């Protein structure tokens, strides 16, 4: 009876101090959706009253929200967005991209165009904002990958905010909030790790510029609309600096050095899914005595949209390794899969229970695009990784993990050559005591990370918003824009070059102009 009273009293205290929380969750990229949904579900399970804006870009991505959520307000996808995404061009573009500032900028411009079309649709055709203006929220949570949330929260009067990121810090966040040094911070889009050499800084600034351009091009279209319909006056940067907390989907065991603000927290592991029992089909598959390699490139750049030459090269390489069983996530049945039905060491699957397979201790190597969630899942399960980074943060994720001695990298360009694939897979499967030691270490660090991340999220949020005026980033120093620093570097180089030419010409004129050589012979 006493225990029942204590439980009742605890529940009363929790619900009595529950917050009204608004979470903006654009349903576009699976990893982003799941990370944000996990935060919503954890807070709702705690007893807080959580309302979620489910801004739907794609119906083939589930919103992952639990029944504990108080209310889900859905926004239908824009017809233009649906048309663009149904062309299937995005995965093809991602597969054909290169790790250069120019190409990553182009990719982000394409994604930014999709986001601003959906935001325009939301502002002009949805009743969402007027409805939200009638509700009082204590604070809101959003991921700034989609800039629409910044404007929505401001026009409905929510100025206490939490910024979350399903990857490491989005470049726009540390730069705008003043918690990093623009010149020395590797961009999320870059292929750099923890440090930048002197000669890498300018190229890195171009990556930073590309990422900021992704947000600026969204802002250039949607800010005037927010101003037109709802009288928004504040610039996006000023609104972002009202944030009180930052949460990142990273873990110190696999991440690199970063400059941190006082209110920045790592909650890598919070998105781990609970392990389920494998079906009899997969149990039978995993009983095969051969080494088993799981191949999955995520939900954005799907295997079925891989360029044909890369598919053929992968297939050729796999066939050369008959003693290895490959389980390949390939999202559709097509001529490519049908012509390989008789291949005995390759299994195609439209869907894979990735978490459960990795946790089975039967997977010897995971070939992955190196998305943050996939990488952390593999480390948590103690599975070796062969990374094939394709776009966005994947190149940097791979570089950081490689620096920490946790993975091997197969550059996408090497997939064109079957011999290089064979060599990389064999290297990934052969004994490597140092690699195994590092993986055991990171796996042990991640063992309780889900519970720890949930507790950190809850305790930090509840402590922060127990005060009426929690501190924000409005007083932090402002950083220079990457483009400004690029111009400064280029101007400095040009000035040094001009000074060199001036000194050289001046030296030449003084020493050689008008100089008369002595005669080397005499006349008689």
From Swiss-Prot:
EC number annotated for this UniProt entry: 2.4.1.17
Reactions mediated catalytically: glucuronate acceptor + UDP-alpha-D-glucuronate = acceptor beta-D-glucuronoside + UDP + H(+)
Main location: membrane
Chain segments annotated as transmembrane: 488-508
Keyword flag Heme: no
GO MF: glucuronosyltransferase activity; UDP-glycosyltransferase activity
Record protein name field: Putative UDP-glucuronosyltransferase ugt-56
Organism annotation: Caenorhabditis elegans
